[in-house]
From Swiss-Prot:
Matches recorded under PANTHER family: CHROMOSOMAL REPLICATION INITIATOR PROTEIN DNAA
Record's protein name: Chromosomal replication initiator protein DnaA
NCBIfam families: DnaA
Region (Domain IV, binds dsDNA), start-end ranges: 323-442
Quaternary structure and interacting proteins, as annotated: Oligomerizes as a right-handed, spiral filament on DNA at oriC.
Segments of this protein annotated with the region Domain III, AAA+ region: 105-322
PROSITE patterns noted in UniProt: DNAA
UniProt organism field: Xanthomonas axonopodis pv. citri (strain 306)
Family, similarity comment: Belongs to the DnaA family.
Keywords carried by this UniProt record: ATP-binding, Cytoplasm, DNA replication, DNA-binding, Lipid-binding, Nucleotide-binding
Lineage of producing organism: Bacteria, Pseudomonadati, Pseudomonadota, Gammaproteobacteria, Lysobacterales
Function as written in the Swiss-Prot or TrEMBL entry: Plays an essential role in the initiation and regulation of chromosomal replication. ATP-DnaA binds to the origin of replication (oriC) to initiate formation of the DNA replication initiation complex once per cell cycle. Binds the DnaA box (a 9 base pair repeat at the origin) and separates the double-stranded (ds)DNA. Forms a right-handed helical filament on oriC DNA; dsDNA binds to the exterior of the filament while single-stranded (ss)DNA is stabiized in the filament's interior.
Length: 442
């Protein structure tokens, strides 16, 4: 609807940029005729908008459209129904497919400068910078960033696109979610406008597509993307893609498309380690103009292990409650405020889950993983599971030992040290470790 962008423009002039970016930009509007629904990605944003911005939103919408009846909901704006087919006797001229325009579809907030580098993402950062500096180079075209949700893949993609535009303001950089590519193609088929659809991709300098796992099982979509990919690759136009796992692991993707995706550079983005998580919390706090003591950042980093999005959610909750109550942010305040969130996080990754995930990964029975047998095929996975339990949970060494058939805490400590040492020289073990971390963080 037209009124919401106008309303958002006014709100941007009235509220701090960090507040608008955090609470208002994620909203999607749906006009239901007699009312307007604003959809938010989660309940926390709904609560903040209701408490802090809803009265002003109602005033502005009433001013722009004469209707201030606004509802808030969690979810995504429903897709518009497909238009009824035109009468056969009066065929309409085909229209261009509704592709996202070149300008304005990249979020300028995401840059290389505000991306927090760590061991888990440094290769991805370096690859994205190279793609922005030397677009189309065969060494990183296509560039595929893969990993679980909320680890910074889209940030790197946006940063590369923004860097391309900064170096060449005339560059036509197109960003699409995979669902948008699919929807645009369907619309083009309905409108008999596939030629226009294909021409739009031939005119761009770089194509950025998020979450290509969505293409799985959609044969026609994969066919069109395959041809689009070939045209861009042959024209040395940069392609940057993201996926929630290594593409060869995605069932339903055609072999020829998997082969194309392997032509360039594929980089895993792993869950951040403790130091990187703490640095992210401190950096995000600075962006919001909030004062966060180091020990609070360390607390959040220690407890929230899965992804960057969860770290940001915890920080937003903390800062919002501090602003509402006027209290200082201390470790005690953080523990009180985030109690339920931290408990849920702890329960999500427990020792039984780690044991089952490791057993399944190595093709073992749980009874064998926990047995006293010391054959190499059992001992190494058992050590990996113990080390993961130490890395991902708050359990003590004796508690971990008890969970592994009553083993002594010194056995657990030896396993942790052994795995850390071996990973420095054993690439396969390091790969296993990172894959298990990703599985447990999903």
């Amino acid at each position: 609807m037209d009124a919401w962008p106008r309303c958002l423009e006014r709100l941007e002039a009235e509220f701090p940029p960090e507040d608008v970016h955090t609470w208002l930009k994620p909203l999607q509007a749906e006009d239901r005729g007699d009312s307007i629904v604003l959809y938010a990605p989660n309940a926390f944003i709904v609560d903040q908008v209701r408490e802090r911005y809803l009265p002003r939103i109602r005033e502005l919408l009433a001013y722009f459209v004469g209707n201030g009846d606004v509802a808030l909901a969690v979810g995504s704006r429903p897709r518009a129904p497909e238009p009824a087919p035109a009468p056969v006797a009066v065929p309409s001229a085909p229209q261009a497919a509704p592709i996202v325009p070149f300008a304005g579809n990249l979020d300028s907030h995401y840059t290389f400068a505000n991306f927090v580098e760590g061991r888990s993402n440094q290769l991805g950062l370096a690859a994205a910078i190279q793609a922005a500096q030397k677009p189309g180079d065969r060494a990183h075209n296509p560039l595929l960033l893969y990993g679980s949700t909320g680890l910074g893949k889209t940030h790197l993609m946006f940063a590369a696109g923004n860097a391309l535009r900064q170096a060449n303001p005339a560059a036509k950089v197109m960003y699409l979610r995979s669902e948008q590519f699919f929807s645009a193609m369907i619309r083009a088929l309905q409108d008999k406008a596939m030629d226009q659809f294909k021409r739009q991709f031939q005119q761009i300098d770089a194509l950025l597509i998020d979450d290509i796992q969505f293409f799985a099982g959609k044969d026609r979509t994969q066919e069109e993307f395959f041809h689009t990919f070939n045209a861009l690759f042959d024209g040395r136009q940069q392609i940057i893609l993201t996926c929630d796992r290594y593409p060869r692991e995605v069932e339903g993707l055609e072999p020829r498309l998997k082969s194309r995706l392997a032509w360039g550079l594929s980089v895993a983005i792993d869950p951040p380690d403790f130091e990187t998580r703490a640095a992210i919390v401190l950096a995000k706090a600075r962006e919001r103009g909030a004062e966060i003591p180091d020990d609070v950042a360390f607390l959040i980093a220690k407890k929230m292990r899965s992804n960057v999005r969860d770290l940001e959610g915890a920080l937003n909750t903390l800062v919002a409650r501090a602003n509402f109550t006027g209290r200082s942010i201390t470790v005690e305040f953080a523990q009180e405020t985030l109690r339920d969130l931290l408990r849920a996080q702890q329960q999500a990754i427990g020792i039984p889950n780690i044991q089952k995930t490791v057993a399944d990964y190595y093709g073992l029975q749980m009874k064998d993983l926990l047995s006293k047998r010391r054959t190499r095929s059992l001992a190494r996975p058992r050590q990996v599971a113990m080390a993961l339990a130490k890395e991902l949970t708050e359990h003590s060494l004796p508690e971990i030992g008890d969970a592994f058939a009553g083993r002594d805490h010194t056995t657990v400590l030896h396993a942790c040290r052994q795995i850390r040492t071996l990973m420095e020289a054993d690439g396969k073990l390091r790969e296993d470790w990172e894959k298990l971390i990703r599985k447990l963080s999903e």
